């Protein structure tokens, strides 16, 4: 009996950002998470911040700039060109993002960008935090069951 092991396939599988149970548990313990998504809404990267996104110190705008840094059309729509991005403390890859985003413009594009931004803020714990942080559990369950 011979075992045919393809190192390239194994390497590709490990590099494809498989979400392990330890990663899921870590996300469920984190307080401030920002999800980056594919154009179809599937989460691709969970960015973990140790501090809360706030309007008064403009950190929410800096996080938005980081979230959309590869999408100049969204940065322009949301007037984030002069904002410095705030890097996350840690990022966990959830799935591969190999899709192209549609070009957003005009009032509809602005609404879509804001909707994507407002749905990005998540929390893994159930402590009192601002209203714009939604529970992460639903997203994690969708990822694990796919």
Swiss-Prot record:
It is found in: Virion. It holds the Pfam family Pox_D2. It comes from the Viruses. One of its GO terms (cellular component) is virion component. Induction: Expressed in the late phase of the viral replicative cycle. Its main location: virion. Keywords: Late protein, Virion. Late protein which is part of a large complex required for early virion morphogenesis. This complex participates in the formation of virosomes and the incorporation of virosomal contents into nascent immature virions. Part of a complex composed of the kinase OPG054, OPG092, OPG100, OPG114, OPG115, OPG142 and OPG157. Belongs to the orthopoxvirus OPG114 family. This is Core protein D2. It comes from Variola virus (isolate Human/India/Ind3/1967) (VARV). The lineage of its organism: Viruses, Varidnaviria, Bamfordvirae, Nucleocytoviricota, Pokkesviricetes.
